[in-house]
Swiss-Prot record:
The chain crosses the membrane at residues 43-63, 75-95, 121-141, 208-228, 240-260, 270-290, 302-322, 342-362. GO terms for cellular component: plasma membrane. One of its GO terms (molecular function) is zinc ion transmembrane transporter activity. The keyword Transport applies. It comes from Oryza sativa subsp. japonica (Rice). Residues 64-74, 142-207, 261-269, 323-341 are cytoplasmic. PANTHER family: ZINC TRANSPORTER 9, ZINC/IRON TRANSPORTER. The gene is ZIP9. It comes from the Eukaryota. Residues 22-42, 96-120, 229-239, 291-301 are extracellular. Zinc transporter that may be involved in zinc uptake from the rhizosphere. It is found in: Cell membrane. The keyword tRNA processing does not apply. This is Zinc transporter 9. Its main location: membrane.
Length: 362
């Protein structure tokens, strides 16, 4: 289901981009344009961003080989705080101001776009929609997990072979690990049942978080890629290559951390990582394909990109503050350690500072 949502989002963004290319009223200036040099820089950008995204997403998964990077270590908490700071600055410093500029552009008619702060409205609604999706999806998958656990326990209680039931449920639990379902076949006292239920709830929550988080990243990554790919100005593209490579690298660390905590099967984890890594490069290729007809100042392009930027900012704000920072800062291990609180607070501020600094070039 999550993969279908991501694929649908990408297709809709591509269609909107083509529509924007056909509607050109405010014509851009050709000053400083160099198609040949721009094309070379775009190819370099595709390669650099692909490598940066993949490397960032892969770092948290190294915890299987390096114990210091496991989800329960101080280093992992610090990395997540740093990545959350990057994501927060991305939303507030990079995406939200761009949306305000686009929806307030003089190329748009005076009403209603330039008379009402649609950027704030869309960002707020996107954050609320993310909250509702987060809550509903978590509740749904938890219920599925409880139903699956009850079914397996019933088979075990009747003296039957639970393995066939376990195999069947493994393909349908959507967010429940095989270990969690299998644990239902073993006798537990009340305390063990409580701990098991808590672990199961955390697992489901991490899986929902990682999927909603990736959906938010996809929205703004496609737009960024299309904008870069459609540009014919080397002076515009050159600083974006380095800025976007670092941007995608840090976002990859955040997403990779969520994927590791969600304990997806290897195939699902690799699919999510590949999808994230390819999103911006695919956007660049779409931009290259429509660059001859695309006009970033057309009303359609400004409205569509402005609304999607605002929605992406709202989603990322919610994910960074609620699902990443609040969850870690409220973690009992963090609350009991003043030293760890200080470390992740500093790393959070460093992430915010570095990503805000990139706003000078991107």
């Amino acid at each position: 289901m999550a993969f279908d949502l991501k694929l649908t989002a990408c297709l809709l963004l591509a269609v909107f981009s083509l529509a924007a290319a056909a509607d050109c009223e405010c014509q851009p200036s050709d000053e400083g344009h160099d198609a040949a040099k721009s094309r070379t820089l775009k190819v370099i950008a595709i390669f650099c961003i692909l490598v940066g995204s993949s490397a960032g997403c892969a770092i948290p998964s190294l915890g299987r080989r390096f114990p210091a990077l496991r989800p329960d270590t101080s280093l992992f908490f610090a990395l997540k705080a740093f990545a959350a700071g990057v994501i927060l600055a991305t939303a507030f410093v990079h995406i939200l101001p761009v949306s305000f500029d686009k929806l307030g552009s003089p190329c748009l008619v005076d009403g209603p776009w330039r008379k009402y702060p649609f950027t704030g409205l869309v960002a707020m609604l996107a954050a609320v929609a993310t909250l509702l999706l987060d809550t509903i999806a978590t509740g749904y998958f938890l219920q599925r997990a409880q139903d699956s656990r009850g079914a397996v326990a019933a088979v075990a209680a009747c003296g039957g072979d639970a393995s066939s039931s376990h195999d069947h449920e493994r393909g349908n639990a959507h967010g429940v690990s095989s270990a969690v379902i299998a644990s239902a076949t073993m006798p537990n006292d009340a305390a063990d049942d409580c701990d098991d239920a808590e672990d199961r709830a955390k697992l489901v929550r991490h899986r929902v978080i990682s999927q909603v988080f990736e959906l938010g990243i996809i929205v703004h990554s496609i737009i960024i890629g299309i904008s870069l790919g459609a540009s014919e100005s080397p002076s515009t593209i050159r600083p974006l290559v380095a800025a976007l490579t670092f941007h995608q690298f840090f976002e990859g660390i955040g997403l990779g951390g969520c994927i590791v905590q969600a304990r997806f099967h290897l195939k699902s984890a690799v699919t999510m990582a590949i999808f994230f890594s390819l999103t911006t490069p695919v956007g660049i290729m779409i931009g290259i394909g429509i660059s001859s007809a695309y006009n970033e100042n057309s009303p359609t392009a400004l409205i569509v990109e402005g609304i999607l930027d605002a929605a992406a900012a709202g989603i990322l704000n919610y994910m960074a503050l609620v699902d990443l920072l609040a969850e870690d800062f409220m973690n009992p291990r963090v609350r009991k350690s003043g030293r760890l609180q200080l470390i992740i607070s500093i790393l959070l501020l460093v992430g915010i500072a570095l990503m805000s600094l990139l706003g000078i070039w991107a």
